[in-house]
A protein has these predicted regions:
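Chalcogenol-based redox active-site neighborhoods
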Residues: 1-198
Length: 198
């Protein structure tokens, strides 16, 4: 991983094609929410498929917690779509068949020249693509467990959600004064947030 991609740094706002061939920017997929970004070898790898299967259950929690999940692999669009469908995923999968991310982040898995994938990583991002934590998943147990991701997201949410603890006198007073910008969805209507879902 590039030496400047560390906690507190801004992660690059890559624009890639998703599993439907639609161009997507990471910042647009993230919106105002924390995000778990999975950098994957691809659907051919049994470790990556197992990881994605485990994330299916977590994704249901992420949706109700207003968090995002995105997977990027070096698969082409057809393989990306098949990978996503095959593991039963419902979050965006992006195709980096051109190895843009792999090269830019310096994460080519040189031990597998036949597939030329990325070294698997999981990056937990605060809103604004701010890096919170990076996991190197070359070995399967280097990847975060579902519980570790829950803990990471708890820490991120407690930092970025002004209404994390609504028992404070300040928040109670703000609510009574009609100052809803301190409460989710922070000045937007719930209908507006529906357009941000994927």
């Amino acid at each position: 991983m590039r030496s400047d991609i560390v906690p507190g740094a801004i992660f690059p706002d890559y624009e890639l094609s998703d599993h439907t061939a639609k161009r997507r920017k990471l910042s647009e997929l993230q919106g105002q929410h924390p995000m778990v970004l999975v950098l994957s070898r691809g659907g051919y790898c049994p470790k990556d498929r197992r990881q994605a299967e485990g994330l299916v259950e977590l994704h249901r929690e992420l949706e109700v917690a207003y968090c995002r999940l995105v997977t990027i692999s070096t698969d082409n669009i057809t393989e990306t779509n098949e990978y996503r469908t095959g593991v039963g995923a419902h979050w965006p999968f992006l195709s980096d068949a051109g190895r843009i991310v792999q090269k830019d982040l310096d994460i080519a898995e040189y031990t597998d020249p036949a597939h030329n994938p990325m070294i698997p990583h999981v990056v937990v991002l605060e809103p604004g693509l701010v890096v919170y934590k990076i996991y190197n998943g070359y070995w399967f147990f280097g990847r975060p467990t579902i519980e570790e991701l829950r803990q990471d997201l708890r820490a991120v949410l407690s930092k970025c959600r002004p209404d994390w603890d609504i028992t404070t006198p300040e928040l109670k007073a703000a609510w009574q004064q009609g100052r809803k910008e301190f409460f989710y969805p922070y000045g937007k209507t719930y209908a507006q947030t529906l357009g941000e879902q994927d």
